[in-house]
Amino acid sequence: MATEKLSTFALKLFGMNLLKIHSISKKILVALLGAFLSIFLLFHASANLCILRNDGGAWYNAFCDFMGTNYVIKAFEIILLGAFLLHIALTLWLAVTNKMARPKGYHKPQRSKTHTGSKLQVWTGILIIACLLLHFMDFYFVKLGLVDGNLDFYQQAHQKFQIPYIAVCYLLFFVIVWFHMRHGFAAVFQTLGLYNYKYGKAIEIIGIIYATVICLMFATVVVITFLQVA
């Protein structure tokens, strides 16, 4: 009898450890995918600044044409889309399973900073998905021929960003992205075990600067384009 109880306990403990390892591996993957997407955003924001060049869009349209015709870039687009979708799926899976694993009647008067940040990530992530649909309708789906629009993306950007409500929507989008990146930057280091009391504050400050620079780059294009005469 004692042996059976011991065996049952061992199996439960082993199963719990496997589930814990499985959950941790997902968190690590979410962190790595988030880091990859953050690097892409820096590239995307830098490329968008070309819209502000005083050349009638020649350089920016040449860049867009290269991005749309190069097979290596096309393959990268698939990888990027896959990384984005996987990042979303795993984040939602972790949020749901963590909530389900919480005992009924569980109550914690003072929520930790990590818990609040994680909850913020989920909600800002959902808002980002909604905003990206707007962005895809304005640009990416036009490139794919799924919706009508100007294939001269320099002119398309000017036409869209000079509409007040669209410009405001994009600026709000960048604010949401800022909050998501601001927490996500530090969360990557925490998940990978690289965050500690000695470097934690510096990591958070760098994350704020990184998120601010990227979002300001995006916002600058929208604001200046909005103020320009088409």
Question: Residue ranges of each PLM-predicted region?
Answer:
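Membrane-embedded alpha-helical bundles that constitute the cytochrome b-like, heme-associated redox core
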Residues: 2-230
